[in-house]
Every structure is written in C-alpha cells, then in structure tokens.
C-alpha cells in the first residue's frame, strides 16, 4: 500500500478519514492524496482572472477549500509523509477516475449516512465508490475509530475475477 486516496469535503467524518489515512500511511510509508471537488457556476479552469472577480462567493469557496487542503497537507507532512492535494470542478473527473489515473492502492473516505458526504461533492455516493472501486475502500462513519483495527471484514462474491486485496 504505497498510495492512499482521501476524498474530502472537510466535514467531521472526512477529517476522521484523513486522520486514519495518516496513521495507515505512517505504518506503510505511503503517500497520501487529498482530493476535493467543488461546484462552480461556470467552467472555472477556462475563466480568466478578471472574470473570476464576477463570482466572489465562488472565489471565497475556492480559497477556503485550498486553505483546508493545505492544512491536511501540513498534517501529513508533519508526520514525515509525502502528500499531494487536488481540487477539481465537479464535472472534471470522478473520484474513481482520479483513483485509476494515480493508481491508488486504497481509498479512505468519510460518510455521514446512507447518502454519504461524497454525494454532496461529486454526485456519486459512497456506496458507488465501494461497489465500483478496483481497490479496497474504508468508509469512516460517526463512530470512534480505534487504530490499529482488531478486525476487518473482507467482502467478496468469490467470482473468478476477484484478486488479492494486497
């Protein structure tokens, strides 16, 4: 496990997921990628600086997200870990596309219920990520997380295409 993806929208459960990812990364000397999706009213990437000023709320939202990502990055780097941060417009890439592109070995995400926080970020929910991810996924909910884990459930349908988790 050398590359961990942590999608976040900076909620409490996503913060718990980030903390767990840092603990796992320390254990396995892994790199962490923190990923945040943001909804913008226009195609922000193609917008020039002068036109950006027409959207002060979006500028504020992007600035806040960048500051939160920097804080997560600092937390990981203070533990001696390599870390990268990514921020995309909602339509730019899906979480699973990002994970595939960067060949993540693991995804750790927060969830606040059956819909999950990721639905608010990218239009997909945690269940979709768990079902469609090609790598193991840990979903952090409201309960207290005690690491290291005492037990882990590995779910499989035992079909031929199932591969080793690690």
Question: Where is each model-derived feature located?
Answer:
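A short acidic, glycine-rich active-site loop
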Residues: 53-67
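Structural beta-alpha unit
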Residues: 73-107
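Glycine-rich, Arg-bearing micro-motifs that act as flexible, cationic patches
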Residues: 109-128
């Amino acid at each position: 496990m050398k590359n961990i993806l942590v999608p976040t929208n900076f909620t409490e459960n996503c913060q718990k997921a980030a903390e767990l990812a840092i603990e796992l990364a320390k254990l396995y000397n892994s790199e962490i990628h923190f990923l945040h999706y943001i909804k913008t009213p226009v195609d922000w990437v193609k917008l020039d600086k002068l036109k950006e000023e027409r959207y002060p709320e979006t500028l504020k939202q992007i600035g806040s997200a960048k500051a939160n990502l920097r804080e997560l990055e600092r937390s990981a780097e203070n533990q001696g870990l390599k870390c990268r941060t990514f921020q995309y417009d909602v339509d730019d890439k899906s979480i699973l596309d990002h994970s595939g592109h960067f060949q993540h070995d693991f995804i750790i995400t927060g969830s606040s219920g059956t819909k999950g926080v990721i639905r608010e970020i990218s239009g997909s929910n945690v269940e979709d990520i768990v079902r469609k991810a090609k790598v193991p996924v840990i979903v952090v909910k409201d309960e207290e997380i005690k690491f290291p884990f005492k037990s882990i459930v590995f779910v499989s349908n035992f079909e031929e295409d199932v591969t080793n988790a690690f």
